[in-house]
């Protein structure tokens, strides 16, 4: 309300720990309850806030997450009669959680939804604190609410852009660039180009295992020795590798059930890079 001068009302229809199946447009009890609330209150809604998915981090549901979320979005819009915006959040973490691959699939699906479904936005949450093994602290929820308000203000009211950085290109750093930015060590560096970087990346640790990135090729995992960022080249990150990587590989970022606690973030928004899983790269 402070940003627009207009009061903001929320219609609460969520339930903690609910899987996507309960939002199934055909017979999901939570979906039907949401429709009841919509019809009871009437009026036109500005958007849907969506933070869900932990209960779908199992084999089967994880693989179908994007498909089922798309069905939910399309059914909701059909019911309302207009393309209501969706403001979504990638999953945070579960301390000592299992099914790493499934967490990676769901986070990746949440990123793809924002890319593939018109009117869907996404925020990253992997640097927010927890009060137990899986739930955000009260402070983290306040911070998340402020981030959502900024993104809603951008989408709905044309305010300043507020999006997490997003990886758009991976290539080998050439000799001139390695020399210019003093990328020494093994001499094997990847250059990552990102969109939506306000100023530059804040990298809390230069150690590769703390970077949040995982790289694999046909020979297995490629150890990441170090990560670098710099102000002169604000929308880039550099990864130093322990060995040469094949021309075709897969890169993942903050994908496990309990990934790194302090991934690289935008220095202005403090939003981590958008998580992704097994992104195919050709060098």
Regions found by a protein language model. Give the residues of each.
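Cell-envelope and extracellular/periplasmic
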Residues: 1-283
């Amino acid at each position: 309300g402070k940003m627009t001068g207009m009061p903001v009302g929320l219609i609460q229809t969520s339930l903690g720990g609910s899987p996507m199946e309960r939002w199934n447009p055909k017979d999901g009890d939570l979906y039907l309850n949401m429709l009841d609330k919509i019809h009871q209150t009437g009026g036109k809604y500005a958007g849907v806030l969506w933070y869900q998915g932990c209960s779908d981090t199992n084999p089967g549901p994880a693989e179908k997450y994007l498909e089922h979320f798309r069905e939910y979005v399309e059914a909701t819009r059909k019911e309302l009669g207009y393309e209501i915006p969706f403001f979504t959040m990638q999953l945070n973490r579960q301390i000592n959680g299992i099914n790493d691959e499934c967490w990676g699939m769901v986070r990746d699906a949440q990123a793809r939804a924002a890319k593939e479904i018109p009117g869907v936005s996404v925020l990253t949450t992997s640097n927010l604190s927890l009060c137990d093994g899986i739930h955000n602290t009260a402070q983290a929820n306040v911070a998340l609410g402020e981030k959502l308000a900024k993104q809603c203000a951008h989408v709905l009211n044309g305010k300043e852009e507020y999006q997490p950085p997003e990886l758009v290109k991976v290539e080998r750093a050439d000799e001139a660039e390695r020399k210019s930015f003093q990328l020494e060590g093994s001499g094997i560096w990847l250059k990552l180009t990102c969109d939506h970087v306000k100023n530059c990346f804040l990298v809390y640790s230069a150690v590769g295992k703390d970077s949040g990135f995982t790289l694999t090729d046909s020979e297995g995992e490629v150890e990441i020795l170090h990560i670098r960022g710099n102000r002169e080249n604000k929308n880039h990150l550099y990864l130093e590798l322990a060995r040469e990587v094949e021309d075709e590989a897969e890169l993942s970022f903050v994908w496990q059930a309990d990934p790194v606690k302090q991934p690289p973030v935008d220095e202005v928004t403090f939003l981590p890079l958008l998580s992704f899983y097994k992104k195919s790269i050709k060098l």
